Amino acid sequence: MEVERDQHKPPLSLQNNKIPSSQNFPVVDLSNTNGELVARKVAKASEEWGIFQVVNHGIPTELIRRLHKVDTQFFELPESKKEAVAKPANSKEIQGYEMDDVQGRRSHIFHNLYPSSSVNYAFWPKNPPEYREVTEEFAKHAKQLAEEILGLLSEGAGYLMKINYYRPCPEPDWVMGIKAHTDFNGLTLLIPNEIFGLQVFKEDRWLDVDYIYPAVIIIIGDQIMKMSNGRYNNVLHRALMDKKKTRMSSVVHIKPPYDMVVSHFPNSPAAIILPSSSL
């Protein structure tokens, strides 16, 4: 089947030019008992990269495995079954299943997770049967992790979950999984499957993110960048397709309410963060 190419001119040429790996990609160990040191490492990573991995984050590895299993089982269902929880056509509703391209190589499903009043189970798959149980258990752990990182900044925030699914693509040089962007929300928690394709833009080049399973990748969004008056970096990133294998990622977006006006903290943008000079 011929690939419907994105409008890239020239192509990405990923197979011909080795994109350098981010060998110094920041990793933060949340099991460290020195809370001040952990906070400084998070601040430093947010300033310099706008993205980092956390290990020993409290989300059980077995739960991550079960989450990827039920997500894969859903996306491998016939299209007619997935359409039962599809996002309504021409609707402003964000929740539900949606195919991103006519050839079915890119698709996703959105769920609101928090607050509970925003959750609409009509858009939650009933097949596989364990989908809701596993997703809700993961949501509890994801909320705890987000609050640990954000502290009081996460109070009153909404939690939106998205599962991205990218089928193998014969010409990955020509088709982008997700085009380069920054996240509009405050904070993103991302857990990929074993086929990883996330890249970040730093120092005028794209870098592969060296993923450490089962770490959680933390991405600083536009709202945190604005609240910190630019000290924290809203990183530009993108996702690639794979020629032979299916890629999938489970993503939780933490966002302020839609009617909230977001602004930087007055007087001193450093008031909410610890200095990193002693690292």
Curated annotation (Swiss-Prot):
| Catalytic activity entry | a (2R,3R)-dihydroflavonol + 2-oxoglutarate + O2 = a flavonol + succinate + CO2 + H2O
Residue spans with biased composition (Polar residues)? 13-25
- Which EC class, in a word? oxidoreductase
Occurrences of domain Fe2OG dioxygenase (ranges):
156-256
Location of region: Disordered: 1-25
Q: A GO molecular function for this record?
A: metal ion binding
Q: Which InterPro entries match?
A: DIOX_N (IPR026992), IPNS-like_FE2OG_OXY (IPR044861), IPNS-like_sf (IPR027443), Oxoglu/Fe-dep_dioxygenase_dom (IPR005123), Plant_2OG-oxidoreductases (IPR050295)
Tell whether Zinc-finger is among the UniProt keywords: no
- Record-linked Pfam families: 2OG-FeII_Oxy, DIOX_N
Involved pathway(s): Secondary metabolite biosynthesis; flavonoid biosynthesis
* Residues where 2-oxoglutarate binds: 164-166, 247-249
> Per the annotation, how and in what number is the cofactor bound?
Binds 1 Fe(2+) ion per subunit.
Q: Which PANTHER family match?
A: OXOGLUTARATE/IRON-DEPENDENT DIOXYGENASE
**Protein's name in the database:** Probable flavonol synthase 4
